[in-house]
């Protein structure tokens, strides 16, 4: 859960934007597919951040992308530190976000229910 308060929300949003730019523009790992950073949850002390990522593709492709992101965590954190100028850069933990898949599944169910007589 993101830290309540304006500073926590702003920092989480900045981390989300910067990590998304780093992933899309600088990471060259072939395991990482089309990944979208969907959100960031910060701990209360700003020392830990869960970065939620949605990846297109099969479950195997998603897992490989997650492995690629995890292996690039040190680089992403270093780049984040140089961009944000924080006293202490949060430890990053990448997590697959299945919300988009769940939304698609629910929309399919609702369409089917709507089309039933």
Kindly give the residue locations of the regions a language model identified:
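Charge-rich, low-complexity N-terminal segments
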Residues: 1-48, 54-117
């Amino acid at each position: 859960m993101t830290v309540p308060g304006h500073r926590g929300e702003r920092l989480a949003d900045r981390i989300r934007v910067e990590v998304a730019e780093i992933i899309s523009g600088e990471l060259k790992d072939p395991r990482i597919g089309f990944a979208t950073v969907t959100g960031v949850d910060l701990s209360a002390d700003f020392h830990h951040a869960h970065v939620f990522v949605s990846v297109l593709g099969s479950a195997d492709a998603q897992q490989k992308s997650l492995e690629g992101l995890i292996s690039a965590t040190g680089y992403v954190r270093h780049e984040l530190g140089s961009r944000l100028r924080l006293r202490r850069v949060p430890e990053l933990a990448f997590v697959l976000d299945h919300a988009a898949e769940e939304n698609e599944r629910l929309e399919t169910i609702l369409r089917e229910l709507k089309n039933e007589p």
